[in-house]
Amino acid sequence: MSHWCPSIFNDIIGPVMIGPSSSHTCGPARIGFLARQLLHHNLKKATVEFARDGAYINMYRGQRSNYGFTSGLLGYRPESYSLHNAFTEAKKRNVEILFQEGDFEATVPNLARLTLESDCGEKVTVYSDSTGGGTVKLLNIDGFDVSVVGDCYEILIFTDNNEDFLAAAIDKLNNIFADNEGFATSSSGEKALINIKRRSNLSPADIAAIKQIGSIEDIKIIEPVLA
């Protein structure tokens, strides 16, 4: 099994980024970069909401969290100078991005909810946390609890919530992807999510093999933001 080496910047000194804040500028940029990949089509609108009693609500402008989220949602990494012109670029692309107070409490200090809509009618809701020093975590995707921190490829397989099927599916997936970094499952009503963590992306053959398992509604891939 192969492993990535730690980065002296991201893991020891601090993130390579456009500032001013690792938690409130770099973190949001990484969150936006990760969340954007949950849409199969082009981003049309994003609503970023902050917990009413959280850290973002009174500082997101001063700490340029709004620039960070916007830049990441447009596909830029936190070290990109494009962060400075994020709003201008969003306007050029006809992408509407709103920032507002949410109706939820801060279960963690830097809790944010992102609701993303594509130009083809897709919609996805993500809860996220900027955990400090530029590190982040996606906590929930469309009602499924997850732990996505951006350090590997996250393969998200949406399927039926059936215990026997899930056990068999995970067994098959484990045989297909013997080099995985781990599996996690989450349920929401009648639906389930299988999350495979890998150090490499999927090939077209890999995707075809997953679909052959049956009862697969969707497959989404999040590429890492940490390197």
Question: Model-found features: residue ranges?
Answer:
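Acidic-glycine-rich active-site phosphate/pyrophosphate-binding loop
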Residues: M1-F9, H40-K45
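A structural-propensity feature for long, helix-poor, extended segments
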Residues: T47-K92
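A conserved regulatory-domain signal marking ACT and ACT-like small-molecule sensing domains
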Residues: G68, F99, Y127-A227
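Mixed-charge interfacial surface used for oligomerization/domain docking
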Residues: V108, A112-N140
